[in-house]
A protein has these predicted regions:
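N-terminal presequence-like segments and the immediate start of the first folded domain
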Residues: 1-56, 60-74, 79-129
């Protein structure tokens, strides 16, 4: 059985999907852009700021499911320019360190041709229950 997870502390879905689904011992988030949930706008034109906001959105969604950043076991990151990997990596490392996570989760990163709203990064996560 699945349960839909929703929080107003992350951007509302812009299509026919949920912020996250809890099923079979996991919370699986939808891809998150660097959108500020208060304004529904991208937070900036740089990938570091968008990465921080996307991760903040994931933290809010995982939190709505009663989990923390330490429960995240897998992250997938999509970027429009793999040349910006180091900026994403720095923001990612800082996020998990700020959350008190000593061993960040497994991760994959892939370059894509484009993302919605002209975003530079999209991040999805899986957390264990």
């Amino acid at each position: 059985m699945k349960e839909i997870i929703y929080t107003p502390n992350a951007p509302a879905p812009v299509g026919p999907y949920s912020q996250a689904t809890r099923a079979n011992g996991f919370v699986l988030t939808a891809g998150q852009l660097g959108i500020d949930p208060a304004t529904s706008k991208l937070v900036g034109s740089d990938i570091a700021a968008q990465t921080r906001q996307a991760l903040s959105n994931i933290r809010a969604i995982v939190g709505a499911a009663g989990r923390t950043a330490d429960d995240i076991v897998k992250v997938t990151i999509y970027v429009t320019h793999l040349s910006l990997f180091h900026e994403v990596n720095a923001a990612y490392a800082a996020f998990f360190a700020d959350q008190g996570v000593s061993a960040p989760p497994a991760r994959a990163i892939a370059e894509v041709a484009a993302l919605p709203l002209g975003a530079l990064v999209e991040i999805e996560a899986i957390a264990a229950i």
